[in-house]
């Protein structure tokens, strides 16, 4: 079937099971071929082909509402709703988004990117439906990994209490990105092996109704048998106790079983949870056999061999530099522990996990818990290293404020994927952390200019015992600089001059330092002398350095790959104002006040005007012509 000719999912209504099976093969082949060129979340989507087709066949989107939790598994949904022809632009600038996007299609009713939000949003839609007295189905699709998130559990509790009509699809592939962890994961494991609970329960109820009423004792005994059945079949029956009708487990690749169960769910009042067992990566052997999450999301790859197409790496990944330095220090200090919320592979903590399994803690998709747990460990003299992506640290903000900073606890937060991350787009750009951390009392915030300084700042963080400290580091690789053998502590709140200059100064840090250096060198050739400062401590700033610089009364430009509002540049402006430098000319470059879409980092930087050319032009406008050297 030519998938690019699909306009909407209505064509599925008249297709037979054998035709649907052929369509499944076509979609898997299409995904494997297309994603080999663009990269993307291949394994999650290969696992939900039949489930997605079944949902679109039995329900009527967009009247019926599908909410894809996390959203990385929505590619099949996009194909069935008329977007196959755009897959060549997947996750590229102004191309097809890798997650549901409301402006992209009327079938995308809820935007996602972070996990565990679908149930709360679905509850909101269902309550709105009931208030408006309409009849559409609301169907959140959530994975077993996302179900461990606290927000999802809060929603389950509320939905079950209110008995709201809703069909929750639990897509259980036993993984989130890496293998799942936790007690709920173990509950699901027991459910997988327990058989079809709801069918057996219905049969028993039918039999019990046939028992003649020969006395209260028999009736009471029969009722107890019925009430106790779930405990005989499944230990806990977690979802039934929460107020859901539990259906399953059902084979998520068997159309007959899917249709039977979903039709049953459509007729059932109140909240229903359909437990669907799927195989992540199904239909492509390299992805299907992956047990650690390598094929969860990938770049381009060779279909035949399963080898990834990667540019030759000339420098280590930032995540590896940080995690390996932490590991090196952990060998000499038993108090150091590593904590991750379900990202051991992305944060490059596999080596730490292998060497110190008892000191490496993966809490699952539970950022709030991870953060406060780290705080608790710090109260007992441990040295917790919390490795967390910038975008996911947003989810634990209150815990950082209330539990870590307020108590001034020695927690080292490794803020991975800081700055623009590219193809994953606006839900994943790490551009807000400076603004939401800089104003917190007791917080120290750093970002290195290169991987060598990065390892020294990790050492600095582990030696620091006066409160919380955080290190920002980018996605991707470092610069390939020489790495010192001996680690050293860098004095807190100190900056360094990278290039001397007399007519203007650029204050920056991290990934924008090469941009600033190149701009300064070009300006030098044009007769403009510009100082470049490595402001590696975003907080506390180097106040002595700032006093000296502001006293020279030369233009100052701050550059940051982070949002301008409340950012580093704002801090410099505040310092100048509060210290009486009222004639100081301080201008800022950074991320404007909007969400930044998906695309390559280079393209996105061009789009927002954060380039070497833009820096050169800005400095020229800041310096009067009469001050420029001939």
Swiss-Prot record:
Requisite cofactors: Mg(2+); thiamine diphosphate
Q: Which InterPro entries match?
A: Dxylulose-5-P_synthase, THDP-binding, Transketo_C/PFOR_II, Transketolase-like_Pyr-bd, Transketolase_BS, Transketolase_C, Transketolase_CS
Q: What is its EC number?
A: 2.2.1.7
User: Which controlled-vocabulary keywords does the entry list?
Assistant: Isoprene biosynthesis, Magnesium, Metal-binding, Thiamine biosynthesis, Thiamine pyrophosphate, Transferase
Cofactor comment text:
Binds 1 Mg(2+) ion per subunit.
GO cellular-component terms in the record?
cytosol
Q: Which GO terms describe its biological process?
A: 1-deoxy-D-xylulose 5-phosphate biosynthetic process; isopentenyl diphosphate biosynthetic process, methylerythritol 4-phosphate pathway; terpenoid biosynthetic process; thiamine biosynthetic process
Q: Where does Mg(2+) bind?
A: 144, 173
For this protein, the record's SMART domains field holds:
Transket_pyr
Gene Ontology molecular function = 1-deoxy-D-xylulose-5-phosphate synthase activity; magnesium ion binding; thiamine pyrophosphate binding
Superkingdom classification of source: Bacteria
Note whether Metal-binding occurs among the keywords. Answer: yes
Q: Which reaction does it catalyse?
A: D-glyceraldehyde 3-phosphate + pyruvate + H(+) = 1-deoxy-D-xylulose 5-phosphate + CO2
Q: In which pathway does it act?
A: Metabolic intermediate biosynthesis; 1-deoxy-D-xylulose 5-phosphate biosynthesis; 1-deoxy-D-xylulose 5-phosphate from D-glyceraldehyde 3-phosphate and pyruvate: step 1/1
* Residue positions binding thiamine diphosphate: 72, 113-115, 145-146, 173, 284, 367
Give the family per the record: Belongs to the transketolase family. DXPS subfamily.
Quaternary structure (record):
Homodimer.
What this chain does, per the record? Catalyzes the acyloin condensation reaction between C atoms 2 and 3 of pyruvate and glyceraldehyde 3-phosphate to yield 1-deoxy-D-xylulose-5-phosphate (DXP).
Q: What is this protein called?
A: 1-deoxy-D-xylulose-5-phosphate synthase
Q: Which organism is it from?
A: Bacillus cereus (strain ATCC 14579 / DSM 31 / CCUG 7414 / JCM 2152 / NBRC 15305 / NCIMB 9373 / NCTC 2599 / NRRL B-3711)
Q: Which gene encodes it?
A: dxs
């Amino acid at each position: 079937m030519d998938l690019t000719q699909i306009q909407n999912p209505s064509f599925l209504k008249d297709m037979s099971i054998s035709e649907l099976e052929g369509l499944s093969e076509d979609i898997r082949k299409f995904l494997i071929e297309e994603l080999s060129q663009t990269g993307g979340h291949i394994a999650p989507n290969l696992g939900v082909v039949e489930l997605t087709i079944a949902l679109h066949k039995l329900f009527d989107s967009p009247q019926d509402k599908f909410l894809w939790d996390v959203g990385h598994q929505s590619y099949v949904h996009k194909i069935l709703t008329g977007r196959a022809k755009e897959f060549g632009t997947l996750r590229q600038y102004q191309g097809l988004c890798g997650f549901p996007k409301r402006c992209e299609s009327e079938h995308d009713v809820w935007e996602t990117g972070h996990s565990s939000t679908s149930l709360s949003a679905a509850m909101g839609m269902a309550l709105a439906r009931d208030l408006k007295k309409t009849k559409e189905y609301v169907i959140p699709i959530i994975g077993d990994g996302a179900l461990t998130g606290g927000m999802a559990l809060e929603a389950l509790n509320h939905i079950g209490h209110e008995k709201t009509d809703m069909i929750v699809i639990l897509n259980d592939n036993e993984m989130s990105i890496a293998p799942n962890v936790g007690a709920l994961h173990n509950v699901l494991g027991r459910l997988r092996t327990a058989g079809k609970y709801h069918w057996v329960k219905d049969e028993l109820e039918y039999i019990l109704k046939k028992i003649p009423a020969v006395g209260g004792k028999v009736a009471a005994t029969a009722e107890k048998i019925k009430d106790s059945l779930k405990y005989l079949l499944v230990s806990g029956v977690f979802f039934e106790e929460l107020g859901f009708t539990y259906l399953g487990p059902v084979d998520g690749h068997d159309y007959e079983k899917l249709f039977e169960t979903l039709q049953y769910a459509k007729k059932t009042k109140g909240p229903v949870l359909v437990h669907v067992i799927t195989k992540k990566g199904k239909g492509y052997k390299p992805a299907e056999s992956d047990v650690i999450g390598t094929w969860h999301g990938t770049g381009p790859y060779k279909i035949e061999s399963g080898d990834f197409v990667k540019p030759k790496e000339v420098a280590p990944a930032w995540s590896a530099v940080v995690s390996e330095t932490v590991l090196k220090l952990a060998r000499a200090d038993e108090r150091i522990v590593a904590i991750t919320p379900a990202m051991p592979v992305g944060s490059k903590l596999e080596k730490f996990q292998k060497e110190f399994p008892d000191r490496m803690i993966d809490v699952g998709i539970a950022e709030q818990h991870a953060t406060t747990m780290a705080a608790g460990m710090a109260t007992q003299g441990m040295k917790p290293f919390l490795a967390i992506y910038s975008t996911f640290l947003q989810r634990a903000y209150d815990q950082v404020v209330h539990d870590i900073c307020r108590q001034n606890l020695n927690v080292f937060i490794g803020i991975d994927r800081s700055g623009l991350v590219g193809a994953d787009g606006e839900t994943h750009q790490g551009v807000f952390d400076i603004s939401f951390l800089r104003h917190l009392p007791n917080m120290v915030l750093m970002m290195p200019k290169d991987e060598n300084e990065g390892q020294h700042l990790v050492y600095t963080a582990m030696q620091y015992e006066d409160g919380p400290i955080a290190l920002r580091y980018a996605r991707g690789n470092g610069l390939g600089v020489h790495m010192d053998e001996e680690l050293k502590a860098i004095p807190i709140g100190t900056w360094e001059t990278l290039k001397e200059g007399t007519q203007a100064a650029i204050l920056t840090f991290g990934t924008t330092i090469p941009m600033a250096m190149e701009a300064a060198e070009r300006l030098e050739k044009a007769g403009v002398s510009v100082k470049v400062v490595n402001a590696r401590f975003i907080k506390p700033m180097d106040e002595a350095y700032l006093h000296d610089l502001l006293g020279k009364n030369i233009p100052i430009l701050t550059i940051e790959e982070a949002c301008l509002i409340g950012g580093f540049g704002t801090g410099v402006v505040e310092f100048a104002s509060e210290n009486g430098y009222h004639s100081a000319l301080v201008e800022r470059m950074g991320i404007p006040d909007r969400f930044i879409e998906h695309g390559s980092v280079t393209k996105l930087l061009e789009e927002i005007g954060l380039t070497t050319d833009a820096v050169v032009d800005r400095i020229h406008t800041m310096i009067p012509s009469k001050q420029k050297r001939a």
